[in-house]
Structures are given as structure tokens and as C-alpha cells.
């Protein structure tokens, strides 16, 4: 099933953990609508801008899957409002930093997170989108005392 021009349902629900543990990762109808919205409003625009495939490393997570991986109970992945994009290592000249900057400077989003990495490039990019209620919050994820901490991106 296609969610948008460039995104399939299989792509955003794919999970090795779900397969391995026999966990259903099927979105509810409401979550499916959210996935369609973020795919059209964010992902497709990133894909069109760069003109190369963009890779989703994490999309939708059912409550059971989120618990199995130790994810945050308040994560927007749980309701189909977030995607993690990891462009590095695909040999098409587009980096995670390129994706991060394009989203930050050009698109509507609720939350954009520069996930770990170095000052020059994040390990991946988390982007959340809420229909009609976007905060444009830009954060950086860092490790502090063995725990993840979110600080304003500078």
C-alpha cells in the first residue's frame, strides 16, 4: 500500500525486532492517516528536493513494539507522526546534515532532532509532523551520564 508518491506502508512499518519477536506493527486507521500526512508533507518534499532515494530507518511503532525496543512512551513514532531518516552510507552524495538543514530551513515540522553524531553530521535525523499544530522545535540528542538528553539545537 502506498502512503504517498514515494512511501509505502511496508517501508514505515518494517521492523527486525517485530519480526524476530512476532509483534504486530500494524497501524490503527488514525495512525495510518498520520503516516500518510507526514509522508506527503515531509518525506516526499525531502525526496523531491534532493532527487535521490531517502532512507527511513524507523517509522511507525505499535505500542508493543515500542515497549520491546525500550522506546519512549510519548514518542511520536507510536502514533505515526514521526520518521527517522538515515541518509549516510548510501553513496548518493546526500548526508544526514543535508537532510536536517533542508527540513529545518524549508519545511513545516513539529519536532526536528539532530540525533547524536558529530558537530558536522548527525547519526540520523528524527522529524515529527502534526497536522495543524507544528511547534518547529529543533533539538539535539546527546548522551549525558549514559542517558539521552535533548537540548536546543544551536
What kind of region is each of these model predictions?
Residues 1-47, 145-154:
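Extracytoplasmic cell-surface/polysaccharide-interacting catalytic and binding patches
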Amino acid at each position: 500500500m502506498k502512503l504517498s508518491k514515494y512511501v509505502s506502508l511496508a517501508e514505515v512499518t518494517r521492523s527486525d525486532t517485530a519480526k524476530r519477536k512476532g509483534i504486530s506493527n500494524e497501524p490503527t486507521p488514525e495512525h495510518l492517516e498520520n503516516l500518510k500526512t507526514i509522508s506527503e508533507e515531509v518525506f516526499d518534499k525531502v525526496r523531491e528536493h534532493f532527487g535521490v532515494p531517502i532512507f527511513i530507518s524507523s517509522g511507525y511503532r505499535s505500542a508493543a513494539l515500542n515497549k520491546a525496543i525500550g522506546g519512549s512512551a510519548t514518542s511520536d513514532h507510536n502514533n505515526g507522526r514521526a520518521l527517522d531518516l538515515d541518509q549516510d552510507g548510501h553513496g548518493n552524495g546526500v548526508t544526514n546534515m543535508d537532510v536536517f538543514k533542508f527540513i529545518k530551513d524549508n519545511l513545516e515540522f513539529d519536532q526536528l532532532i539532530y540525533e547524536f553524531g558529530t558537530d558536522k553530521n548527525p547519526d540520523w535525523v528524527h522529524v515529527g509532523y502534526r497536522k495543524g499544530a507544528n511547534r518547529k522545535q529543533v533539538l539535539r540528542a546527546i548522551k549525558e551520564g549514559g542517558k539521552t538528553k535533548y537540548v536546543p539545537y544551536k
